[in-house]
Amino acid sequence: MNIEEFDYDLPESLIAQTPLKDRDHSRLLVMDRETGEMKHLHFKDIIEYFRPGDTLVLNDTRVMPARLFGLKEETGAKVEMLMLTQIEGNDWEVLLKPAKRIKVGNKLNFGNGKIIAECIKEMDQGGRIMRLHYEGILQERLDELGEMPLPPYIKERLDDPDRYQTVYAKESGSAAAPTAGLHFTDELLIEIKNKGVNIAFVTLHVGLGTFRPVSVDDVNDHEMHSEYYQMTQETADLLNDTKSKGHRIISVGTTSTRTLETIRRDHDKFVETSGWTNIFIYPGFDFKAIDGQITNFHLPKSTLVMLVSAFSSRENVLNAYKTAVNLEYRFFSFGDAMLII
């Protein structure tokens, strides 16, 4: 299967640069998973597609203000560091810009010494493992010194950083938002609960792979990045009960999907667990966890387009994307949404 099979034409003007004033006023393309039949609504209308007994699964990760600007201690050269994934203790996987002159042993200074980052391992494509030295609590230092790490295709400054967080964001650790969740408001979630729909949470911290394109021609040769996930006993019990009663599990975003499918693959049921997943979902994948998913419109030739294609079909998804382009839907992180069910 060639990467070019997941390409599509997208005018740059359709890449949403700012969020809408009201989260749930974005447009919603509802697509039948089997037939590809489409309907066009607004996100607040999504409640029409939920049934009592369904469980909606949200990723409660919180985006860190993880973009830092500092100086190389030895030379005073300016450097930008994007913190991606906590490896262990104070060791973090990061992206540096520029990176080529940052070698093992070099130190970076942020905020006049409030954070010192020492390079302990070089990786490819600008990646490094850095050991952080700081006083107090890291989250407080990041809140003081860091900026929100918006995706590279967003060129405009975000006036309100909370608009790149879901309203239910809780567990800090992501380098990017689980953007399908950005459409939900507190009020909409209450309406959904009042309809008899369960709300469950998992955590998956979005990391390095979000910022890197697929670099191989043959999809089978792609190595997926690893991301940390966790599921509580409460969520596991609720999901197992949903399945046993014949109700549906609907995931919000590809991150929730990857978490749920990882756990069902590894344990044959939902269990309290945590770990790292590099699950790669592309056409031919056998879904065992979800019955529907909510997702944004993703970048051409990305693993996320492959994931949604696996859940329906490549033909259905690319036809839906072509329709969305023709109808001038908004694309990517601050864009509109799909419900595939």
From Swiss-Prot:
Pathway: tRNA modification; tRNA-queuosine biosynthesis. It catalyses: 7-aminomethyl-7-carbaguanosine(34) in tRNA + S-adenosyl-L-methionine = epoxyqueuosine(34) in tRNA + adenine + L-methionine + 2 H(+). InterPro entries: QueA, QueA_dom1, QueA_dom2, QueA_sf. SUPFAM superfamilies: QueA-like (SSF111337). One of its GO terms (cellular component) is cytoplasm. Its main location: cytoplasm. Keywords: Cytoplasm, Queuosine biosynthesis, S-adenosyl-L-methionine, Transferase. One of its GO terms (molecular function) is S-adenosylmethionine:tRNA ribosyltransferase-isomerase activity. Its EC number is 2.4.99.17. It is found in: Cytoplasm. GO terms for biological process: queuosine biosynthetic process; tRNA wobble guanine modification. Monomer. Belongs to the QueA family. Transfers and isomerizes the ribose moiety from AdoMet to the 7-aminomethyl group of 7-deazaguanine (preQ1-tRNA) to give epoxyqueuosine (oQ-tRNA). This is S-adenosylmethionine:tRNA ribosyltransferase-isomerase. It comes from Staphylococcus aureus (strain NCTC 8325 / PS 47). The lineage of its organism: Bacteria, Bacillati, Bacillota, Bacilli, Bacillales. The gene is queA.
